Amino acid sequence: MDSQPTHFQLRSVVHDTLKSHQGQISDLTAQHEGSLKQLFLMFKPRNNMLDKEYDHQAIQGGDESLEGFDEWREQYKLGEGSSVNTISIPNLPAISPPATTVDYPDEPSVDLPTVASSSTSAARPNPIRDPSSSIIDSPLTNVPLDTSITSLVDGVEEEPTVNMSQIQPRPFVPRDYTPPPELDVPEWVPLDNYRPAATPTTPPQLLMPLTSAYATELPPLPLLNSTSSSASFRRRKRTNSPQPDMFKLQATFSLNPLSSALTRSSKCVLTCDWKVAMDEMRHVRAMERIEAKKAENRWSLRQPKKARGPGVPKSHWDYMLEEMEWMRTDFAEERRWKVVEAREFAYQVVEWHLASPEEKKALMVGGRGWGECRNVPIPGHAGKRKEVTVEVEAEDEDVEMLVGQEGELDGEGEANKVLESIDEMRVNEKERENRPEDPRETVNINQDIGEEVDAEGEADADGEPENGEADAEGEADADGGPVGDDVVGLSEIDAAQDDTRETSERPSYRRDTVLPNGLVIHKRFANAYEIAIARGPVLDTPLANATVDLDTLTKSSSAATPATVPAEPSVSPDEPASFDQLFPDLAMYSGPAPPENDKKYRRDEGGTYSHRMAHTSRIMDIRPILVSTLQPAKNLIDGEWDLHDGPYYEEVKGAADIPPNVVAAFNTPFGGKASRPLEHMRVPEVPKPAAHHLRAQLLWSPEEDKCLLKLVAMYPFNWDLIADSFNTEMILIPVEKRNPYECWERWYYTFGEGKNKPRQDAPPSAPPPAPASATQPGTATATPVPQSAVTTPGVPPSANLPSASGRPQQTGGNSVSSLPTPTGEALPDGAPPPPGMSKRDRMAAKPKYEGTKRSVRHQAIYDAVKRMNRRREAARAKSHKDNAQRKVINVHESHSMSFPHVAASTPWELVEAKYQRDVQIAQQRQQRAMQEQQRQLAIRQQQAMMSAQQQAQMRPPNMPNVPNMPNAQPIRMGPNGQPMPTMAPSQQQLLNAVAAATAANRQNANGAVQGNPNVRPMPVVQGQSPQVQQQMLLQAQQMAAQQARVLQAQAQAQAQQGRAPSMGGNLQPPQLGVSSPFAQSRTPDLPAEGAGPSGINPTPSPAMQAAAIGAQSSPQIATMGRAPSNNVPPHLRVPNAGTSSPQISSPMALPQGIPNGAGMPVQGAQTQGIQIPAAMMNNATVQQLLATLAASGQQMTPEQLRGLMLRSAHMQAQAQSQVGNPGTPQMGVQNIQGVQHFARSPSLQNAQSQPRSSPKPGPANGQGT
């Protein structure tokens, strides 16, 4: 049930609603007032638009423009009777002037419709009305507008224009305001003030796709340097830069280290940033070490000069380094000299080609001109040929002379042939320049310049047969027929003369011309100028034409200037020139030609199919670089580029991403550079190991296939590296590692060319073997299948296994290939053994393991373990047999003693034995200490008994028998003659007692005289801390209580002996037994066990009573006030049965001079047989407990007080129950029943439990170790 809203909640809601409405009303009021102010400013200037002072007032603005606004605002104020709705705002006409048909030089002409004049304003949709008819109630007086826009200025009529104030009254008026519709806007007439710029004389630059105006303004890049980028970067550094101040840097880094900012950085911190911080910290640490050394006077600003060490003799390596240094210098100088020589030779060659013939003659050796070397005899040369004048009369002699001369000329060397070819080229050039008309003049010119021409009637100078020339005597005929013995006659000489004349009359033709730059001009062109004219039409062809017709070039080439020397007749002038003739400077593309020799795969270096083609784009000449990569704002400084790295210095040579098949076609990882198809790249089969029959076929998961493809792409067809990388990355089990053959087989038959090909080792008709494991879709884990599903019924298991000799089959099962047959060949495709085989061969051919990969591995491991066990047993039996047969030679009869074989003890047994031995040693030491203490205690008891007897004789009869002790406090007696409880001794008295006890122990340790009661207490040091004083106080209380118990027990025994005859009856004499304040004989909650009829415990022997007193003491007081045994380490002490604390050792010797029974009257009265009421006893006990707690500095709480009382009562009950079976002093009071022993060994829990017996043979309880 929903609760009703309270009155306070309703009031709060109404208040919030009214407040929000009031805020909205105030916002609307402010907006309304602003809107009214804008409307007032828009309506106000409409009557002053033609006023000349309007512009000046509008510029000044201010509060004067709002004059009359308050009266006008009252009419349109929000509320009842407001006339806001009566305001009407006319529409705004077009602000921009109407379009015209003026043609500008830089704009295309557009035919636009003409705008109607002002006479047709009646047809407009928004007619302009007269201002007097406006419904807008303006606060100002309406002034009629002057529609005449013309005015006379200095007698000059202005051009018809429109004042902007008529269209837009004020510049700051919003755009949504329109002038009154009564305003008649005349037609806009543009002024003739457009003066366009003159047409530029130079055409504008057409930017190419790879250029921009910004890039063209940048300066050119510097030339590439041959040095590395690092050298240029080092050169960029300034050598004269001042060294930084190290101490200033240290102060800066120490005050504001960069490392502190990096650790709290909110942005990404790169490695370079951390390196900067590390360098900074390294510098700071170095400077700190320097400052530390300076403080220790171990740093000097002037470092001492390093001492010169002894000379080291040179070794062979030192001499070799010296020689290498000298050779390096020699080679560097030789290289520089060769560079200088080559430069000088290049300058001389250029100078030679640019020199005139006279200058060339001066430049040549000896000052002779070019071609004059034939006039200089060469030593050892036969000399130049001589012209022989032949007379007609001596024909026979001439014939003999010609024959002999011909034989001499045949012996000339190749030098003459070279000179002849050079002379012939020189003659041809001069003939082209002179252009002789008569061929006979050519012969004369040749004779003038020195060319050898055969004389009339002589044979050819070269001795070579020309047209129709007969062979020499003794040589074979030209037609192959033998020559007779006839001698050459004049007919042959005349024929030779006629042939020579025909040769001289024959015209010379042009040959190919070689230019100085190495280009060869075709013989159809005389010079390079003709080539430029011939290929002009090709270069002038528009870019839109994709082809060029060479037939159109015939006329242009024939129109060239006729050459001096005609071309060969084989070159027809009507035949068009080819592209290789027109462009000899460009390499023509030719496809790869078949090899001509046996080297099939040798690359054709002379072919042009692998070279750069013709110059078709400027990208082939330049390297386009984006301007953004150069970063001109960063690297362009004062018009110079500062580039030392980046894409500008990128190496041109780089390795491209070549497909693996292309790489494999040119190079193979297994040797050889000849390309081989992928079929020939099969990896040779890896040698099978000895236990190959134990290897199961491995399955390939999708992840492994992906890794294999990645490695094949990374290391193309390097199967050794692929297998190694695959096993490192994917395989974790050694038995599942893949070898290179398996990797190649998986790739070839799954992803390579053999994907759709049948395997060579698989029979074509054999069905695929049944899978031995089923792989779940999406997983790579094989699910084992029962063996019955693997094997085929009626067929041995080996029939379902792949062949052992071929490559491993990719089957679903994990079965092991069978063993080879006795002939050395495995059964093909796991077929059953033939029937003729023996049983042994059948068993050998049968597969050893079957099943999944895991089961096969487990079986193999199990068999290996069994074989190892058998070998171990065999080796052990053999060793026993050898030991039995071995004869033992006894050197002495003591060596023949047989010792029982004892197994080695475990560490726990050794520790236990050591502990038992230490316990025995400690007990023996403690017994000796106790005996010494008992001897000293007997001496003190005798002295106490003597002093007690003396005091008893001097005491009145009505006083209780209390031993008279020195410094004893008087006992206050009650009204019935019983002693009253007294308060505990003061702190100073207890401190004095502790000092006296310490002095007594020191005297006993030093061998002083025992029994001296006059022990001078040591003064208490006033500067001791409160904790030390409290500890000494507790020790004094403990020692005083123990000494009082012993003395009172002695006095009680003596009193019983002296009063026994006189007392009579069953009443026992009063006993002055003193006990610990925490050990009460009986409490209301815990009654004492073994008490007599009167409720008083029987009196034990003095030694046993001392033990009982030790058991009744509090654990806290006994722990802090115990006296350590004589020279017994704490870890070797064994507690006795007389105490419940594990740290209290045997009773110690009590010092003399301690008051007996001081502060213990209640316990003494109870020991004497005086019955103390429970209330009085509890009061005394509580007082003692409070005093003890206050002395120890603990907080006194009821819970803690009650716990201490219960513990004291329980301990007292245990001590009383043990009185019936006391132990002798010689036994060390360890046989008291019911008291637990807290020892180091967990095997001993109490005195009744026996020590644990050792499992090994030997003395019981570890006593014999």
From Swiss-Prot:
Residues 700-751 form the Myb-like domain. It is found in: Nucleus. Residues 114-140, 225-244, 404-510, 555-575, 755-855, 1053-1093, 1212-1265 are annotated as: Disordered. CDD domains: SANT. GO terms for biological process: chromatin organization; DNA repair. Residues 800-821, 1073-1083, 1212-1234, 1242-1253 have a biased composition (Polar residues). It comes from the Eukaryota. Residues 304-380 form the HSA domain. Component of the NuA4 histone acetyltransferase complex which is involved in transcriptional activation of selected genes principally by acetylation of nucleosomal histone H4 and H2A. The NuA4 complex is also involved in DNA repair. This is Chromatin modification-related protein EAF1. It comes from Cryptococcus neoformans var. neoformans serotype D (strain JEC21 / ATCC MYA-565). The gene is EAF1.
